[in-house]
Structure formats: C-alpha cells, structure tokens
C-alpha cells in the first residue's frame, strides 16, 4: 500500500497520527489495497513510476497547491503558467518523453492547476492530421515551446455541430496562400483554452474554399501573436472571454480573423491537400479530419473525467467515517454518517461508477491503440466504431462524473460547500466536461445514428446481399434473447449473466423501437430529417442504454479475469453488481416497459441492491485508498489520509488573507453607520 506517511504531505505537524475513526477502517483489510492499486495502474512497475513522479512533484515548492484557494484570477493564471513551464523544465532535465507516462502521472497531481493543456491538444491534432513534413516542422517547434499553440474550433455561434462553423479559408492560387477570415460576429472563435493571453499560434478549424467550391472543415496553423513581443499580428483580434464558473486559471479566449494569410503548407494535409493551382485532393474519408477530436476525447477519459470522480469519492467517503451525526439508537453514541443506509446509497454507487469507468476506459484505450495506427495509414474500417465508442463514453463518463461529484459534495453537508474541501473545484471541472469537446446530448445522438445503422445491418437476412460483419461492440443486436428475465429471487440478481442479459435486452429493444419509430414516420411521408428530429428523444434514450450496457459487460469481463486474485475479485464483483443494479433501478421503466421485468422482480433487484450496500461499506475506505491519491493531489481539508478534518479546516481557514488584512469596509461603511447611532443610544 506504500508508506502512509508519504500520503500526508501537507506539512501539518499534528497530522503524523491517523485519526482512530479512519484508522479502524483500515484494520484487518479483506483484500490487499496495494495489489488493487497495482491492478488499477496496470502493473507494479507503473505504480512505482507513478509514485516516484508524484513524490518529485510534491517535494517541489513551485507545485504547492494549498494557497490556490485564496488567489485572485490573475494570480491563478500566473501561478498555473509558472507550474506548466517549471514542469517542462523538469521533464527536459529528466528526459521524459513527450507522450510518456511520467507526464500523465504529473498531470494527475496537477490536474486543473497547470495551463497550456490546449498546447498538447493542438500538437495531437498536428500529429493526427499533419503530413510527415508538417509533423517534423511544427511538432519540433511545439515540443521545444518555440511556439505555443491552441486548438481553435468552437465559435461564438457554433460548437459541437462542426458543419455549422463559419470561419472560412479561401485559397488564393496567385500567392499560394489561404485567406483565413471570420465573416460574421458568430464566426469569432470562442472558448479555446490559453488563447486569451498566452498562445502564439492556433490550429484553426475552417471551411476550405478552393476555386469557388467548398470542401468542408479542415485544420490550418495560423500565427496569432508576434514571437518578438507577443503583440497580436495584423488582422488578428484576440483576448480573454472573462470570468467562468471554474478553471479560473485558464485564459479561455476569443479570436477574430480579418483576411489573415497563411502559406499553403499551413493546411494540415495527411488526409487532404490543395495543389498549387487550387486543385483539391482528398486522401481519406470526410470524417478523417475529425481524428484530432477523437484522440482528444479518448485522452480526456483517463486524464480528465475519471480522476475527478475518483477524487470526489475519496474525499466524501473519508469524511463520511470521520463525521458523526445523530444516533442509530437512543442509547448509542453519535454514528459515523457512513453507517446510515441513505449515505451509503449516495456514495457507494459513485464508487462503483468510478471502477466501472476505469475498466471501460482501459478497454477503450486498448482498442484505440490497436486501431489508431491503421487509421493513420488510411485504413478507416474501424473509424466508425471507434468514433461511436469514444463519443458515447465521453458523453456518459462526463455526465456521470458531473452527477457523481455533486452527489459527493452534497453528501459532505455544509463543509462540502467550502472550497477548502476540494469538492467545489472538482464539481466545476466535471460540469465543464459535459459541454467541452462536444455537448453530450449531441454526442449521444451521434452514437444513436451509428446504432440505427448497425441495427438495420443486423436485420438483413443472411445471404440476401453481401454484408459486412457487425462491429464487435454492437454484435449483441443480432443475438436472440429471452423475452422475460428468469430471475426468481433477489440473489438471482447478483448473477452477472442475469443483469448483463437484462441490459443487453433493454438496450437492443430501445434501439429497435427508436429505429422503427423513425421508419414508421418516414413511411407515412415524413421527411427523413423531420422523422429523426421527432424521434430523437427515443434515440437519445437508446444511446444511453447502449453505453451503460457496454460498461456493465466490460466490468463483468474485467472481474472475471481476476481469478488469481480471489479477494479483490470478490469486492470488485460486489461493485459490478451494484453498478448494474443501480442502473436497472434508476431506469426501471425501461425494464418494465414490455414485461421483461415484472414489478415483483424490480423489488427483488432493489433488495439485492440494498443487501450490497453494507457489504461494500466495509471496504469503502480501502477501495478509495486503492486510488492512491496523496494529500497533495487531493488538496482537500476533508479528504486527507489521516482523517484530521476539523483541525485542518481550522488551520487552513487561518491562511485566508481576510484574517490578516485590514477591512476597508469597516472604515468606509460599518464604522460611520454605527457611529451615527451613538447619540441615540
């Protein structure tokens, strides 16, 4: 499990002893926390490397996080830029590779607190969409920070709907340049991170126009600021968009382009190029230009969304064994709030979601790495499935993380509202993830289109026409299933085969219903686009069920592979059961709709769910310890490893500048008002 002393890293001298209420939770563990940590990390070497990197970060005073809660917006920005460049110097000195695990582990500690993350996203876009020559040129400049880049896609008037973007790139054959222009107010690029005050270049998404013909969205490298004095270049209007709900350290910006010229070579050209005379040549599918977004979404799953919920669970569960409230019996002392079933019902499903998403993300990463190299070689056969999986998992993961972090915050009562708990920061980070890199409803509907096509493909009679095999993730659509659930007792609902089959049945039924509703409208004469719009709510429901089914099935399969770890397999099986049953109870109407489940069976599922809560509660602290977040990484007064919540809250509050600075409002307003009443007293 590592050295517990390494986890208590915030410097309080009184924190060398662990609070007995949390210490008792770690006595006589039912499984090896250290071994589960190794499994989550993908092996002992990864755990050891991650801890070395985290220890390096935590010992460096530049990476101190404690003071951030008391900083102004400008101070947060400057501090985050300093952290990023200090990290780069550290990486260079230690020989870390650009895409190596060390940087991922460093980001795990500093997540949300270091700037220039969009520089990495823009570099990924260049590596995904650029030619070998462009990668050699721009990749090296970006790696050395000779240029600083952002990815400029979203506009004031459009975001997820890429075809609606208005920025134009018109090719001028006489000069062999592209003229990049924002033709309307709504075409101003809006929201790109680091654009407001920092970057020198942007990867700009714009509609390509050649010889009067439009060829869809393409990516262009556009200089934004002078490399000499950082002033905006001619034709560039750029700035900061102002305060936001969160991420106040990041200078999200706007960019207006007024006929800005860039060389022909600045269009990223792995999958399409414009010849000197203006002839357009496509070298891939139209969807291949979205590959940069796909890479970003996959990375966000394990670098952004998942750690946010894992941290929130760790904080809330630890606080729940320190906080005592009311009595279970009149003669008892006040109980830990985690003893209450209602608190377990709030927190333990979030813990189950954290583990379910971990194994789903691991599986998706494996599929991504196996197919990405083929896509770069212009083999696009797996691109539709990879797009559907990454899009669906982005939507579901960010939705669940946003919901889960807020549930964890509320479960901590009033103290959860304090920034010192660390939870408000996690909540605002998670909420933002539901709309950046694609608004989730739109993303679910993209998945739904893939599902409708797959369902129709699955219904084609064998041998009638040449048929491509169904993608692996939707092969279940062609598999017959019983029309009724066979479960007869609550214990039956703890059988993975029972609930996995139930989820497969309901997902397939919803996909079928959505498709048939759309087709019925079209047969009645409704235009296909109107028919889609009029059934989009049903399609949305089907896409969500499909994504949930995939995580249930994947979690089940991941647990089955742990036969050589029986203690860990047991506790993870409980979490898998809880995840599947919580989804069934939350969406019980879908399972009752056509009688697949009866009302009595839903009651059985609820009994099975409630029976799981005390079993998982016994291991809850150990399951959060297995995430192996240090105190530095959590930056939470409520969630520290030692459990000294109240001392830490009080000590941190003393650091507020309001406690040491003179109160100007007293002289200006309070004292004059109070003195005006003196003669009357």
From Swiss-Prot:
Q: Which CDD domains match?
A: AXO
Q: What is this protein called?
A: Peroxisomal acyl-coenzyme A oxidase 2
Query: What SUPFAM superfamilies does its record include?
Result: Acyl-CoA dehydrogenase C-terminal domain-like, Acyl-CoA dehydrogenase NM domain-like
Provide the reaction this enzyme catalyses.
(25R)-3alpha,7alpha,12alpha-trihydroxy-5beta-cholestan-26-oyl-CoA + A + H2O = (24R,25R)-3alpha,7alpha,12alpha,24-tetrahydroxy-5beta-cholestan-26-oyl-CoA + AH2; (25S)-3alpha,7alpha,12alpha-trihydroxy-5beta-cholestan-26-oyl-CoA + O2 = (24E)-3alpha,7alpha,12alpha-trihydroxy-5beta-cholest-24-en-26-oyl-CoA + H2O2
Modification Phosphoserine, positions: 9
**Record-listed N6-succinyllysine modification sites:** 66, 137, 303, 453, 561, 667
What does the UniProt record tell us about how this protein is modified after translation? Acetylation of Lys-667 is observed in liver mitochondria from fasted mice but not from fed mice.
């Amino acid at each position: 499990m590592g050295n517990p002393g390494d986890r208590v890293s915030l410097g309080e001298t009184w924190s060398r002893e662990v609070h007995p209420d949390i210490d008792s939770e770690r006595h006589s563990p039912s499984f090896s926390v250290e071994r589960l940590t190794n499994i989550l990390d993908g092996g002992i070497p990864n755990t050891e490397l991650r801890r070395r990197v985290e220890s390096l970060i935590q010992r460096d005073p530049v990476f101190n996080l404690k003071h951030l809660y008391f900083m102004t917006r400008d101070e947060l920005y400057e501090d985050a830029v300093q952290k990023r460049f200090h990290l780069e110097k550290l990486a260079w000195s230690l020989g870390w590779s650009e895409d190596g695990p060390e940087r991922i582990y460093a980001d795990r500690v500093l997540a949300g607190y270091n700037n220039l993350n969009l520089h990495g996203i823009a570099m990924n876009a260049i590596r995904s969409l650029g030619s070998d020559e462009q990668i050699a040129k721009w990749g090296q400049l970006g790696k050395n920070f000779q240029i600083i880049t952002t990815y400029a896609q979203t506009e004031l008037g459009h975001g997820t709907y890429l075809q609606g973007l208005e920025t134009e790139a018109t090719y001028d054959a006489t000069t062999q340049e592209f003229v990049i222009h924002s033709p309307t107010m709504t075409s101003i690029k809006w929201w790109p991170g680091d654009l407001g005050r920092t970057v020198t270049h942007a990867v700009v998404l714009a509609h390509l126009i050649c010889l009067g013909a439009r060829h869809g969205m393409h990516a262009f490298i556009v200089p934004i600021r002078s490399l000499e004095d950082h002033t905006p270049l001619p034709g560039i209007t750029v700035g900061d968009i102002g305060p936001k709900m969160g991420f106040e350290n990041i200078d999200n910006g706007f960019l207006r382009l007024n006929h800005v010229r860039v060389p022909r070579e600045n269009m990223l050209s792995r999958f399409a190029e414009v010849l000197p005379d203006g002839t357009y040549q496509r070298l891939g599918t139209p969807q291949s230009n979205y590959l940069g977004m796909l890479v970003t979404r996959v990375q966000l799953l394990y670098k952004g969304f998942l750690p946010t919920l894992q941290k929130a669970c760790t904080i809330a569960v630890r606080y729940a064994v320190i906080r005592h409230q009311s009595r279970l019996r009149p003669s008892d002392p006040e109980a830990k709030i985690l003893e209450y079933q209602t608190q377990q019902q709030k927190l333990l499903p979030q813990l189950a979601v954290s583990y379910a998403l971990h194994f789903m993300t691991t599986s998706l990463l494996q599929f991504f790495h196996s197919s990405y190299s083929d896509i770069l070689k212009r083999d696009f056969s797996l691109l539709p499935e990879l797009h559907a999986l990454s899009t669906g998992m982005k939507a579901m993961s960010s939705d669940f993380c946003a919901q889960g972090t807020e549930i964890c915050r509320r479960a901590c009562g009033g103290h959860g509202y304090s920034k010192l708990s660390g939870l408000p920061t996690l909540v605002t980070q998670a909420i933002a993830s539901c709309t950046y890199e694609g608004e989730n409803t739109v993303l679910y509907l993209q998945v739904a289109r893939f599902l409708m096509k797959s369902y129709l493909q699955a219904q084609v009679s064998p041998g009638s026409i040449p048929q491509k095999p169904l993608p692996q993730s939707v092969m279940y659509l062609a598999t017959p299933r019983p029309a009724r659930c066979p479960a007869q007792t609550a214990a039956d609902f703890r059988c993975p085969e029972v609930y996995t089959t139930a989820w497969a049945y309901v997902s397939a039924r919803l996909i079928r219903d959505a498709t048939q509703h759309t087709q019925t409208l079209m047969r009645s004469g409704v235009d296909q686009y109107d028919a889609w719009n009029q059934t989009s709510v049903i399609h949305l429901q089907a896409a969500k069920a499909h994504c949930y089914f995939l995580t249930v099935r994947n979690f089940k399969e991941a647990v089955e592979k742990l036969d050589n770890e029986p203690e860990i397999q047991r506790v993870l099986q409980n979490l898998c059961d809880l995840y599947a049953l919580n989804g069934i109870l939350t969406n019980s109407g879908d399972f009752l709709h056509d009688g697949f489940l009866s009302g009595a069976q839903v009651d059985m599922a609820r009994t099975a769910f409630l029976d799981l809560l005390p079993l998982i509660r016994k291991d809850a602290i150990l399951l959060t310890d297995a995430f192996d977040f240090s105190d530095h990484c959590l930056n939470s007064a409520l969630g520290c490893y030692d459990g000294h919540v109240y001392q830490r809250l009080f000590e941190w509050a003393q650091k507020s500048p309001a406690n040491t600075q003179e109160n100007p409002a007293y002289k200006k307003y309070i004292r004059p008002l109070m003195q005006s009443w003196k003669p009357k007293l």
